[in-house]
Curated annotation (Swiss-Prot):
This enzyme participates in both the breakdown and synthesis of glucose. This is Phosphoglucomutase. GO terms for molecular function: magnesium ion binding; phosphoglucomutase activity. Substrate binds at S103, H104, K113, D243, R244, T303, E322, M323, S324. Belongs to the phosphohexose mutase family.
Amino acid sequence: MANIARDIFKAYDIRGIVGKTLTDDAAYLIGRAIAAKAAEKGMTRIALGRDGRLSGPELMEHIQRGFTDSGIGVLNVGMVATPMLYFAAINECGGSGVMITGSHNPPDYNGFKMMLGGDTLAGEAIQELLAIVEKDGFVAADKQGNVTEKDISGEYHNHIVGHIKLKRPMKIAIDAGNGVGGAFAGKLYKGLGNEVTELFCDVDGTFPNHHPDPSKPKNLQDLIAALKNGDAEIGLAFDGDADRLGVVTKDGNIIYPDRQLMLFAQDVLNRNPGAKVIFDVKSTRLLAPWIKEHGGEAIMEKTGHSFIKSAMKKTGALVAGEMSGHIFFKERWFGFDDGLYAGARLLEILSASDNPSEVLNNLPQSISTPELNIALPEGSNGHQVIDELAAKAEFEGATEIITIDGLRVEFPDGFGLMRASNTTPILVLRFEADTQAAIERIQNQFKAVIESNPNLIWPL
């Protein structure tokens, strides 16, 4: 039996610490396992790309050898943003591709996001890869798969510039956090006719300025300062592999992705009345009424880019988004999460206004907390912890308890959420209400539930 760290096989992807849990041998074996699944589905070619992390080239070499030793051909697109890899996979490889990325994890992490035949691998499909590795269930190849190298950045760029039309040129600031999006974002937005101020757009896998995670307010402070001190009208920020978008207004307000989705949904519904819109369990309770008000069907899903993509395929939804910043357009695009493209769609909408910040600031808003995290004791299972807490929890005044992903408790004047993260050993909490008093009341109810487990420390 092959020796591989089981805990790198996560819910949405494979992710580990390079050289410790994610080794060169592991990359090779994972390549063999993905190739076995591809062969089973009759696929002969896989697109392969990497982000700007320092460990990317070496991992790429070993996973690629896993493919070719199994007789699977490789379209190697080099260093790209994750959505560019998806673009190559869909247009050149029948929807099969692997992206080597650590997303927003610390610099010593890396991993693989995978799709086969247009389906993103998640949950059980990822556990099947582990089973193949552990049982040596690899395919024997008659001959080596061949490798073709291709720069797809031009095609990707032209595809977007070809159909996104701004009403006027805008002045924008972008912050790539030294992630791979910095290699492409400036050129893309200039190609749409904008004047672009670039922050931290040189790709550097050590992330020397701030962490490339736009879901955390501290990582947007440089962009906020640039907007206040310069003449840019709007700020866009990206995570390490540019499949997530952060948005900041001229006056320094962070427009979280659930509010971004209000604007995107309204735009899509203008052209497609009755369309389905998907959002994740962490989203504002103001979103579903907004979607219905604008003639759409609102669907809540569990958090996770692979789950959302799967739900989009199942329901035929035209647009979706989740609180972490993944925005998915099926209308006029391919249905995968793409921070660069979402930025372009946002500029297309905002260019119709002389005051884009006003448009964003006028979107409905409640009082809410950012995402709050509770560290779990070493070796504990977050989903099990949630189940144990939920079993004895009581919520006075609750109107609905939603259990599709953790516990979301709705009240007449707000909601509280606790769920297990699928990527890190933490519980995630979020609260929203009409008033500060209501948010504190809801938090206190959750605090009592959390503190029933002596190993958990309330984060506020």
